[in-house]
Amino acid sequence: MAFYSYNSFLAIFWTRLPGHSVHPPCSHFPPLAFFHLPDSHLRTAYMKNCGSRKYSYPGLTGNNKVHPLRTRLPQKLHTTCWLQNHPGKPQPEQIPEEPKATDPQPTKDDQTEVAEGKWSLRQKIIDEVKYYYNGFSLLWIDTKVAARIVWRLLHGQVLTRRERRRLLRTCADVFRLVPFVVFIIVPFMEFLIPVFLKLFPDMLPSTFESESKKEEKQKKMMGAKLEIAKFLQETMTEMAKRNRAKLDDDSSDSSQLSSYVKQVQTGHKPSTKEIVRFSKLFEDQLALEHLRRPQLVALCKLLELQAFGTNNLLRFQLLMTLRSIKADDEVIAKEGVKALSVSELQAACRARGMRSLGLTEEQLRQQLTEWLDLHLKENVPPSLLLLSRTFYLIDVKPKPIELPPSIETPKTNLGIPSSPPPESKEDITDPAPQLNGTKILQAKSQETSQNSKANSKGA
């Protein structure tokens, strides 16, 4: 009885343990488990088996024999290892996973654009502080330089054109700061300075203006000047028609004037002699006293002046500006055009209603020298000179960059028969079709000759 209870307890104990299943020694075999089941007499136990190997428990050796009966129970093994591919059995098809669509990574340019677009309030404040600090520092430097120029002027020294213009610019910048004194004197009014600057940005000195803003302003003024130039060209053609009608049709002056106007309209660049010759016909009509309001307004815009007020005020404004231009021309002629820098050349051409953008340095010097020759040497009226510059304002274009001619290396003929050079590159054709055509013509000529011989023999 004790033996029976011992064997039954031992069998139940081994079947209830977590190690009741044994992993196969090779991954090619299916996961099977063999359990020990007691026989009818409860004297022997069946052993676990995997394949052909047998495992016996300690204590079950001796005279106890093992029956060949085994109970085979399939059971899935919980393991983290993959089964190896068996060479004899077909493997289940594995569906490849589709690659997941990954979002494109933002480039550095996109990151910089996002960073620039999302400026914080602190960065904006820092940029504004730097902007005003640089403007005031440049204004302080210009003020010190202007003080030295004034000291030299008081001691009787003669100033150059560049020094005089710098002194005038600095004085204008200092006087622009006078209205801001009111904001400082009145308490708590300094908080309105940003609003005032937003409404009137031109009240700041020239040292606060950046290069990009200057270029944008010049481009806008250039577009307005082109429109004004077209209007002034129409006025010139109308005046030419009137003068041609007044003159006799048979006279040489009328025919030459008509041809001159046609050449100018087609883009011909008139010479100084032609301008001087035909300027005598327009002296009375192009005087400031005889110009109408649309023409006066157009000339004021051409010289970048304010076009507000009565006709007499516009004439007086134009007269004073033309006098200052003549004095400046005399100084430039005395110092020489070559002494001017590129920025000074552009400013001088812009003040005289000529093109200043899109030209080379040589073209700027050339048109300025032509202006000086006509204004100082030939004594052309300034109003006519301004109207004549409108044709240059549209027609003048920058010169293309000339490339140096390519150096061709001499070619040597290595035993190849030289062929006659073609007349032009466009006349080069393939000789194969021509040869085929000649062969066909030769064959046809032979056939016709044979037919003619046969006919003659038959006759």
UniProtKB/Swiss-Prot annotation:
Residues 26-176 are mitochondrial intermembrane. Keywords: Membrane, Mitochondrion, Mitochondrion inner membrane, Transit peptide, Transmembrane, Transmembrane helix. The keyword Mitochondrion applies. It holds the Pfam family LETM1_RBD. Residues 198-459 are mitochondrial matrix. The keyword Transmembrane helix applies. Residues 1-25 form a transit peptide. GO terms for molecular function: ribosome binding; transmembrane transporter activity. Residues 220-440 form the Letm1 RBD domain. Testis and sperm. InterPro entries: LETM1-like_RBD, LETM1/MDM38-like, LETM2_N. GO terms for cellular component: mitochondrial inner membrane; mitochondrion. Residues 97-111 have a biased composition (Basic and acidic residues). Residues 435-459 have a biased composition (Polar residues). It is a single-pass membrane protein. The chain crosses the membrane at residues 177-197. Residues 88-114, 403-459 are annotated as: Disordered. One of its GO terms (biological process) is mitochondrial calcium ion transmembrane transport. Its main location: mitochondrion. It is found in: Mitochondrion inner membrane. This is LETM1 domain-containing protein LETM2, mitochondrial. It comes from Rattus norvegicus (Rat).
